[in-house]
Amino acid sequence: MQIGLDFNLVEDLVAGVDEVGRGPLCGAVVTAAVILDPARPILGLNDSKKLTEAKREALFDEICAKALSFCIARAEVEEIDRLNILQATMLAMQRAVEGLSVTPKLALIDGNRCPKLSVPAAPVIKGDSQVPAIAAASILAKVTRDREMSAFELIYPGYGMGGHKGYPTPVHLEALARLGPTPIHRRSFAPVRAAWEAREGITDSLI
């Protein structure tokens, strides 16, 4: 049985912000900002990692239907490689908050640091398992990114992206070594860089 967070904790015009995708070797980092409506309860909100895929999908639709405002944003692979993953994540969070159709009086950010925002903000460590709005944001971000990685499975077969979602599992690392990086792999990440350099070495030896 999955028990959700207490919806009575929801405050007026407080945005919850979270990210998914800092650790994977490929794909964008996806963020979401959500302002919940205290008058429209959503049961079962929790850290997206603690929910089944089916529950996340159901909550995704309910959050989109009932939230006062939400925005899903991202930083692309090129931005991650240019800025580094931390700065790209901060940029994506900034985009999510700025994309809200309603201006929050406060943004609560999952983690231990905040992006530069035009509204007051505070970090909340493990916020996705404490603050309903952050939990909602974690669900929107994870479902969005998981759907993208499942789509990439069809575009780049052989890597198992629909299963590991880009994380550095043994299956992914083996495929990376065997097939080489794709255009959506983050070349600033060490395993990808090593695979790229190995491929370059093979190419050079064949010339």
Swiss-Prot record:
Main location group: cytoplasm
Recorded GO CC terms: cytoplasm; ribonuclease H2 complex
Disulphide bond pairs: none
Cofactor(s) this protein requires: Mn(2+); Mg(2+)
PROSITE patterns: RNASE_H_2
Biological process, per Gene Ontology: DNA replication, removal of RNA primer; mismatch repair
Catalytic activity of the protein: Endonucleolytic cleavage to 5'-phosphomonoester
UniProt cross-references to SUPFAM superfamilies, sorted A to Z: Ribonuclease H-like
NCBIfam families per the UniProt record, alphabetical: PRK00015.1-3, PRK00015.1-4
Name of protein: Ribonuclease HII
Organism: Pseudomonas putida (strain W619)
